From Swiss-Prot:
Name by which UniProt lists this protein: Putative chaperone protein ClpB2, chloroplastic
Segments for region (Repeat 1): 6-71
Gene3D superfamilies: Clp, N-terminal domain (1.10.1780.10), P-loop containing nucleotide triphosphate hydrolases (3.40.50.300)
GO MF term list: ATP binding; ATP hydrolysis activity
Cited SUPFAM superfamilies: Double Clp-N motif (SSF81923), P-loop containing nucleoside triphosphate hydrolases (SSF52540)
Gene it is expressed from: CLPB2
InterPro entries: AAA+_ATPase (IPR003593), ATPase_AAA_core (IPR003959), Clp_N_dom_sf (IPR036628), Clp_R_dom (IPR004176), ClpA/B (IPR001270), ClpA/ClpB_AAA_lid (IPR041546), ClpA_ClpB (IPR050130), P-loop_NTPase (IPR027417)
Organism: Arabidopsis thaliana (Mouse-ear cress)
Stored PROSITE patterns: CLP_R
Key words of the record: ATP-binding, Coiled coil, Nucleotide-binding, Repeat
Domain annotation Clp R: ranges: 1-123
Region I: start-end pairs: 129-375
Ranges in coiled-coil conformation: 368-462
Spans annotated as Repeat 2: 77-123
Length: 623
């Protein structure tokens, strides 16, 4: 027997069957010994298939009682497996006449058991995919709602519905929401809001890191990838793969000298046997994917642009309930609007909506942390009480000193006053804390009930959906409303995330003072001339002209798609032309370092123009 053709589980089963035959003093191992070994494992495919095909555990027990023979050596059947697996072993076993007779005698139909094994074998194939990935459709109910992006999702659906080259690749800057488009597709598949060819499809997010991990020998990575691709092919169009950072497929496992994944993917992608969604950034796509023309032409590009500030505000409003439920806080709408505006203005190294969402998330986490920490007023009083108790303990030892006795009396009186002041505050704090904790618990319960309601509606379980929608959920909603109404009187604890919390987080990220962030844009523009005069002395006409031009542009009186202002400062050396430009940059962009200064006196020579446009081809620094 060639052990290399059997997976480890089968080897264990065969060894166990052999031991069982030896314990019964039988001269050979027959299919019946193998049957006893398989059915004795309550988690095995054989046991589960018999219980499903028959009368549950009763049928399995009947089979155990009838089987008392030994095992017959099996050969691999043509089921497309590279190795003999447990499912193949069971199907081969069912074809044996002895086992068939035993099952019939036990009241179980062999054909029905075989069909159940085939069904379970399909689950095993899907489990192989899940080893290196995650089914996004299964998790769709727990994912964040996808607001907007309908055009991109529709484009992805259209590409997936093609006959060949049905592989969309999402291209966009980091943080614009490429993965969210795929999550939106998963939610549509779950709801059934997709064409027939995508109904019931599994959307598997493949992790190349998990596939590469532990591949110490050459060929191990390719073997894993081939098993995944074979599982997708056997699913016959019911599985769509998604790989984030698709450019990794062009370099996965190259360091060990192995073939990169793209060479294994190309044939199936071209024939349409594999439906595949990729995602990568513009820079990575240009650097890695475009260089491999054969790989690139098998994909259809779907560009994901950065959303505008109004679109970001809509996205934040859609995510509001999720973050409120997770953190147990309430988010004001003004905080969401300010988050989008401040992140666009001050956080320049990242993209919307990612930076705005992170801003809201951190603000919520900060407020939640403050809720879990004792208020400063109570903490200060408790420290004073502890300090006085220590002093009393020390003074009580000095009974002969009259001054100590007088001080002891004074300290005791002060301690009683502090305790009288601390007790009502502690009671109020505990009451407010209890209300907040109960509100958190009810909101979490509401989220769980909403997920259960969506599941009941998908399964068309009308009675259960009605009980949840008009019973349990409404009761929880009314309880939450009642608690939130009573929480409005909270003085010591606040669970509200407001604009001041957003401004505080932006200040921590950027170093810009909170007072400047809180300043209204309208007030800043009106006082622009005065602020410029604080730095530029004199030059009234120039300052007035600059301030008026900026004000006209910002209020919308200027031409659209034009700069806020274009100024030509003329005058002799030293009168303040550069200083006015620096002051203007400081007022508009909060730092004079954000001014790009080109000193044209440095460009007198012909060759110095290379400083602006770069070196010509063939010269150093050309790229």
């Amino acid at each position: 027997m060639n052990d290399l053709k059997f997976d480890p589980n089968v080897k264990l089963i065969l060894a166990s069957a052999r031991s069982h035959a030896m314990s019964l003093s039988h001269g050979q191992v027959t299919p019946l010994h193998l049957g006893v070994t398989l059915i004795s494992d309550l988690t095995s495919v054989f046991y589960r298939a018999i219980t499903s095909a028959g009368d549950g555990d009763i049928s399995a027990q009947s089979v155990v009682n009838v089987i008392n023979q030994s095992l017959y050596k099996l050969t691999k059947r043509n089921l497309g497996d590279t190795k003999v697996g447990v499912a193949v072993l069971v199907i081969s076993l069912l074809e044996d006449s002895q086992i068939s007779d035993v099952l019939k005698e036990a009241g179980v139909v062999p054909e029905k058991v075989k069909s159940e094994v085939e069904k379970l074998r399909g689950e095993v194939i899907l489990r192989a995919l899940k080893t290196y990935g995650t089914d996004l459709v299964e998790q769709a109910g727990k994912l964040d709602p996808v607001i907007g992006r309908h055009r991109e999702i529709r484009r992805v659906i259209e590409v997936l519905s093609r006959r060949t080259k049905n592989n969309p690749v999402l291209i966009g800057e980091p943080g614009v929401g490429k993965t969210a488009v795929v999550e939106g597709l998963a939610q549509r598949i779950l709801k059934g809001d997709v064409p027939i060819n995508l109904t019931g499809v599994k959307l598997i997010s493949l992790e190349f890191g998990a596939m590469v991990a532990g591949t110490t020998l050459r060929g191990q990575f390719e073997e894993r990838l081939k098993s995944v691709l074979k599982a997708v092919e056997e699913a016959q169009g019911k599985v769509v793969l998604f790989i984030d950072e698709i450019h990794m497929a062009l370099g996965a496992c190259k360091a060990s000298g192995s073939t990169d994944a793209a060479k294994l993917l190309k044939p199936m992608l071209a024939r349409g046997q594999l439906r595949f969604i990729g995602a990568t950034t513009l820079e990575e796509y240009r650097t890695h994917v475009e260089k491999d023309a054969a790989f690139e032409r098998r994909f259809q590009q779907v560009f994901v642009a950065e959303p505008s500030v109004p679109d970001t505000i809509s996205i934040l409003r859609g995510l509001k309930e999720k973050y409120e439920g997770h953190h147990g806080v309430r988010i004001q709408d003004r905080a969401l609007v300010l988050s989008a505006q401040l992140s666009e203005r001050y956080i320049t190294g990242r993209r919307l909506p990612d930076k705005a969402i992170d801003l809201v998330d951190e603000s919520c986490a900060h407020v939640k942390a403050q809720l879990d920490i004792q208020p400063e007023e109570i903490d200060s009083l408790e420290r004073k009480v502890m300090q006085l108790e220590i002093e009393i303990h020390a003074l009580e030892k000095e009974k002969d000193d009259k001054a100590s006795e007088a001080r002891l009396s004074e300290v005791r009186k002060e301690l009683d006053d502090l305790r009288d002041k601390l007790e009502p505050l502690t009671i109020k704090y505990k009451k407010e804390k209890k209300i907040i904790n109960e509100t958190r618990r009810l909101k979490q319960n509401r989220d769980d009930l909403m997920i259960a309601l969506q599941e009941a509606e998908r399964q068309h379980d009308v009675p259960k959906a009605a009980v949840l929608k008009y019973g349990a959920i409404q009761e929880v909603e009314s309880a939450i409303a009642k608690l939130e109404k009573s929480a409005k009187d909270n003085v010591m604890l606040t669970e509200t995330v407001g604009p001041e919390n957003i401004a505080e987080v932006v200040s921590r990220w950027t170093g810009i003072p909170v007072t400047r962030l809180d300043q209204n844009e309208k007030k800043r523009l009106i006082s622009l001339a005065d602020k410029l005069h604080e730095r530029v002395v004199g030059q009234d006409e120039a300052v007035k002209a600059v301030a008026a031009a900026i004000l006209r542009s910002r209020v919308g009186l200027g031409r659209p798609q034009q700069p806020s202002g274009s100024f030509l400062f003329l005058g002799p050396t030293g009168v303040g032309k550069t200083e006015l430009a620096k002051a203007l940059a400081e007022q508009l962009f909060d730092s004079e370092n954000l001014l790009v200064r080109l000193d044209m006196s440095e460009y007198n020579d012909k060759f110095s123009v290379n400083k602006l446009i770069g070196a010509p081809p063939g010269y150093v620094h050309w790229s």
